[in-house]
Amino acid sequence: MKISANSIRTGNILVYNNDLWVVSKTPEHTQPGKGGAYVQVEMKNLKTGTKRNERFSSADYLDKAELEQKDYQFLYFEGDDLVLMDTKHFDQINISKEMLEEKLSFLTENIIVKVEFYNDKPLNIELPPTVILEISETDPVIKGATATASYKPAILENGIKVKVPQYLEIGEKIVVKTDDMTYVERAK
């Protein structure tokens, strides 16, 4: 499938120079005073792991990889792999931890993730947009802090540090965005 260079987003998997590349940073759209507009894209080769910056004209069209997406349930870690189970057919697969990198700490028991396949080979794991986690460390509640819009640091059960409202206490569950690791709301 062809997409415009202006439509490239972080996480897109492109077929470029006969290799698969994942867009690793938000593309920069630039309109210089002289010359045509272009898009600066940082990509990572899925086979070799090498990173590369590439500049495409805004008028260019690139091949976006046709991916098949399936729901899988995270079961457990086995060495350097994640063990996932297909939610429809109950088949289990092992996928390298490296595929998730810094998002690995969001994996909780039984979480449902989307695994993207290219030619029956797992390429990418998409976490749900938000997860519910428990606060394990934070400063004590300050009386009257509900009226102010200030935040305090908190460490969650998975070790991630986030800023939370002053009124939250240790042991409370909160909703956290998985893409930028920010607090959304108190879990219901």
From Swiss-Prot:
<dbReference type="InterPro" id="IPR020599">
    <property type="entry name" value="Transl_elong_fac_P/YeiP"/>
</dbReference>
<dbReference type="InterPro" id="IPR014722">
    <property type="entry name" value="Rib_uL2_dom2"/>
</dbReference>
<dbReference type="GO" id="GO:0005737">
    <property type="term" value="C:cytoplasm"/>
</dbReference>
<comment type="pathway">
    <text>Protein biosynthesis; polypeptide chain elongation.</text>
</comment>
<comment type="function">
    <text>Involved in peptide bond synthesis. Stimulates efficient translation and peptide-bond synthesis on native or reconstituted 70S ribosomes in vitro. Probably functions indirectly by altering the affinity of the ribosome for aminoacyl-tRNA, thus increasing their reactivity as acceptors for peptidyl transferase.</text>
</comment>
<dbReference type="GO" id="GO:0043043">
    <property type="term" value="P:peptide biosynthetic process"/>
</dbReference>
<dbReference type="InterPro" id="IPR013852">
    <property type="entry name" value="Transl_elong_P/YeiP_CS"/>
</dbReference>
<keyword id="KW-0963">Cytoplasm</keyword>
<dbReference type="InterPro" id="IPR001059">
    <property type="entry name" value="Transl_elong_P/YeiP_cen"/>
</dbReference>
<comment type="similarity">
    <text>Belongs to the elongation factor P family.</text>
</comment>
<dbReference type="GO" id="GO:0003746">
    <property type="term" value="F:translation elongation factor activity"/>
</dbReference>
<dbReference type="InterPro" id="IPR013185">
    <property type="entry name" value="Transl_elong_KOW-like"/>
</dbReference>
<keyword id="KW-0648">Protein biosynthesis</keyword>
<dbReference type="InterPro" id="IPR008991">
    <property type="entry name" value="Translation_prot_SH3-like_sf"/>
</dbReference>
<dbReference type="InterPro" id="IPR015365">
    <property type="entry name" value="Elong-fact-P_C"/>
</dbReference>
<dbReference type="InterPro" id="IPR012340">
    <property type="entry name" value="NA-bd_OB-fold"/>
</dbReference>
<protein>
    <recommendedName>
        <fullName>Elongation factor P</fullName>
    </recommendedName>
</protein>
<dbReference type="Pfam" id="PF08207">
    <property type="entry name" value="EFP_N"/>
</dbReference>
<dbReference type="InterPro" id="IPR011768">
    <property type="entry name" value="Transl_elongation_fac_P"/>
</dbReference>
<keyword id="KW-0251">Elongation factor</keyword>
<dbReference type="Pfam" id="PF09285">
    <property type="entry name" value="Elong-fact-P_C"/>
</dbReference>
<dbReference type="Pfam" id="PF01132">
    <property type="entry name" value="EFP"/>
</dbReference>
